[in-house]
Each structure stands twice: as C-alpha cells, then as structure tokens.
C-alpha cells in the first residue's frame, strides 16, 4: 500500500527514467491498491504485492540488467506476465494496466491511502457511500460528521481521519530509511567515481539511522578542480536544481527527495561531518561544552580565538571537549554526552554480533520461498540458526496454519535438520493474540514447538487499558517466547497501538519473555525509545527480520540501526547467543 515517502506517487511518467527496483515495486503496489479498491480477485492482488516485495528486496538492478541485454533472473512469484510488466515499466516508467486502472477510477483516489487507517477496502467504502475521491472530499465528509455513520468507521475513526489530514498538511515529506538508503547508496557510489573525489560520506538523519529521512546531506572532500559539483547537478535522477555553487549545491530528485552536497576542505571534514550528522540538540550540547572551555565549535572546525585547534576528524572534535567519539546513532541529546563523560557509553551492537533470526515466513503462508531456501539464504548471510514462524489460522489473508498444517511442518523441519549442514531450523509459529488475549492455537500444538512468537494483527483500536490487558494475558500464556512488533505499527500507514509499554516490559521481565525489534523497514518496531526502555528494564530484545523472502535478510542492518539507536549492546539482544546458549532460554518460555 502506498504511504507517505513511498516513491510511487512520483514515478508514473515515462520521462522519469532510468527506473530503479523501488520504482518497479511502487508500480506493482499501486496496481494492487487499485485492484483492491475495485474489489477484484484477492489472489491477483496478492500476486502484485508479493512481486513488489520481491523486486524491492532484490540486490541487483533489474533495469540495468535489461539495458545490458541480459535476461531477467527467475524471481519467486514472478511469472511471465509480471516479468513482461517489469520490462514495460523499465522502458516506459509505467505500464498499460496501471494506465487503464487510472482511467477507470478517480485520478486522486490513491491519495486517500496515505491517510493512516485507510486501506483499499475503506477507500472503496468511502467512495461508494459518500463519493469521496480526494483528500479534500475526505476532509469535508469528516468535518460534517458523515464518516462516523458508515459501517466499520465510527466516531473514533472519523476523529483520527481529521487529525491525520491536519498532520499531513503540517508535516514535511519523509522517506523510510530503506528507501532513502537506496538513493544514498547510489549517489555515494556515483559521486565516489567523479575524478578528484577523495572521500564521500552521507551524513544527517540517515547516518543516525532514523527510521524516516527528510533529506540527504552528503559531504565530499575533493582535489582542487574536481568537477564534482557539475556532475552532481547533472545526475540523471535530478528533477530540479534548487541551488548551485562552488562549495554547496542542492537538488530535488524525481522521487521528491532533496539532496544537499557540500564540498569540505580536509582540515574541516570532521567538524563538518559532526555538524551535519546532528542531531541539532546534540550539537548544541557539544557547543556548550566547548564554550565552557573557551572554544568555538562549528562546521568549519574547533577554534580558540582565530586559531583552529581541531576539526579534521570527528574524534578531534569530541576530544576537544574531553569526550570519546560517540556513535552517530546515539547523538540525540538523550544522555549520551553525560554517559560519555562518565565513561559509560554503551558499545552498540554490530550486525556481525547476530547469530540467528527468530522470525520468518515461507511459502506455507505468505512467504515466497521454501524452508530450505530460507535456511540456506540465512546461512549465506552469516547466520547459524533461524526460526520458521508462520502465521496462525486466524490470519486467513496470509493462509495461516491450522494445527494439522503446523504439525506437518514440524515433521518437515525435523527432516530438513537431518539434511542441512551449518544452519539449524527452529520450529516456531507467529500466533495471533486474539482480542481477549488468548492465543490462536491450543497448548497441545504449541508445546511441540521450540518457540512461540505472539503478535497483534487485529483489533488495533482497543482502548489503552484493554489493549494492555490483552497483551499481558498473552504474556501469561503457558507457551509464549517473543512479543512480535509490539506496537503493531506500520510506518506512515498505521499508528502504534495504544498500550502501556512499561507495564508490558515489566510483565515480560517477570515472566521471562522477550520482545522483538522487527527489522522490516515498514515496521522497525520496537522503536528506539522503547528498545532503550527494554534495556533499562532488563528485557532481552530479539532483532529479527520477519523475512518473507530470501532477500529479506538484508533488512537486518536496519534492525541493527534501530537497536543501536536504542543503546542496545550485544548482550541485550537474544539472538546474539549461540544456539547452545539460546536453547535453554527458549525452553524456559515453553514451560520446560
């Protein structure tokens, strides 16, 4: 589904080529949205959503392959029809099916999908009942109190719609970290190839691994006479040049993302990197420390009077105020400076610390690959164990497993573990937490598993007290290991459920349960604040991908970024343990 910051709203025009994988995925997502609004076959809709996910997670650029005359690789869930559409999108920036759907539906109706809580079915309901075709139509209907009268809406939903429309007007556009990361990586590699460029760093909120990014700040050190600025504004993804100068230029990409490039002399590179990495609050706090020592700190360096005393490296900037280097993810003025002064900075977890992944799906439900394929991909990613955790029966849209199918999968995993080398597959389930807090599968079945991952997939609008009680009851279950994506949010599409997270963490600690930090770029849930709270409460966090394809293991880097923002060290993360260390920790959650 399209959400704020998704590039789909910007790519649907043949002039916007070359096309990247994210653009192809966005076209497929919009086709799926429009088909769902029209009420078409859910299997066809799912095929487009699955194809979008597969393409977006692919490490190779499909347009470049096609341009080079290569055949499209065989992709899970992408048959000849979808492959043909990929080639068409790469050539034209759109496809005939999308153009036809746009002709059949009001042109601005997909804008409604950007309002949190409005999925295609609700958009269709609004259109059928109230002829709502635009955000302005929606604002008027909500203001007149007409939406509350529709089935499935009510006063609370109407109020949230009004709030979302108001927030949408006030908030600047932001891009999910993974989307911004695609542009950042491409730009960084392209700029690095410009003659005379010696160093390139993407700074800003992207370097701090914030879950959404407003713009990209790129710093460059280059030899005199380097054509880097001319090349930058001529980059083929540039839609408009906002400013151009000898040391600073700004452009807006065709996706809508603004990128600022600064040419920095070597003696100032560290100071500029610190300054433009931010956050603003962190920089202010560091400058105050400098002022107390008679120093002036800015993007050009550290000065005592007119004399530069530091600034070529970030370490020299921090050292000037008697601080060790502080990792970028911690720089939010949330106690990192005080911790550094006390010598108590955490040693944030690294991607290499992870030994396994405790949440993934396969073709048995809504994944794209077999258990064997997922296990081998995890092994290739450097992991030594994975847990297969399919959806349970209540989640019919994902073809969730009933007890019989789950028992059959348990036998399959046992057979596979006898054949695989270098990777172990754990038997799990992502069981739905029902509205009353009970679990979707009986204990007689759950007891056969290595771990149980529980998740909220429905009744998101319960009041705080009831939603919290629901999760607390689930944590009391006889078999319960990890609370998955605890806030149940989807960035830009669904707000977090209203719960008392501190109460949940304390209950998890008391009952010996764990919480997940879901690394999917659409989720990143736990957020950084709650991840840090988990650390402070002594609750271990599982950084897991929620992988639905072999490509999804690349998302671990985003989960690690969020974990670092939450001050998590390797010891704070459940799946940094070896399998031998992990098994007793899982067994305790299963009543063994």
Region locations from a protein language model:
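Charged, compositionally biased N-terminal leader segments and the immediate start
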Residues: 16-40
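Accessory alpha-helical DNA-binding modules that contact the DNA backbone or grooves
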Residues: 18, 42-249, 256, 261, ...
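Alpha-helix C-capping/helix-to-loop hinge sites
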Residues: 31-38, 58, 168-171, 459
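Short linear capping/connector segments at secondary-structure termini
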Residues: 67-71, 103-104, 392-394, 430, ...
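Short acidic-aromatic active-site loops that bind/stabilize oxyanions
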Residues: 177, 363-364
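Two-metal-ion RNase H-like nuclease active-site motif
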Residues: 202-205, 356-360, 430
